[in-house]
Amino acid sequence: ETDTLCYNTDSYQADLVGPTKIVYDKETTILSKNGWYNTSTEKSMLLDRSQIIHTDGMTLTGDTIYYDKFIGFGKVLGNMQSVDSTNQMTLYGDKGEIWEDDNHGYVTDSAMLVDWSDSTMYTYMHADTLFTEEFPYQTYKLLPKDSILVDSVLQAQKPDTMWIDTTYQRIRAYYH
């Protein structure tokens, strides 16, 4: 939906020159006033505070957004805001990248994470750079020491490890 659109039939590129709404199979909606969108490659460059909204609860907003729907990648420059309404958290910053398929991303330059999952308390985290990644929730069983076999580690399907980056030394966390 748009009131003004310039479309090049040779390059399959639509130039967005007014308020525009692009819908992909009822699962992703793009709202923008300025930029371009290629109907063949599903790549777009969105300007002037645009928004990408997914039906799964994810919303990406920024001054300039490069978005590749095919590989599920978004890069934001200027006033980034990534809202995850399913997990009830918002990621803010000046620059960032999001990978939809792997459910991870990062934000830098005035990076802040707000967790609003608890209705009585908000948790704020601020750092130079914040990385976000989704880890599956796992339950563990405590076993008696003598019941663990020597080769039980080798039989594990997937190693249970978490990587921690200690490069960034200044971090603040506070709640409201």
What is each PLM-predicted segment?
Residues 1-176:
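Mature-chain termini and adjacent capping regions
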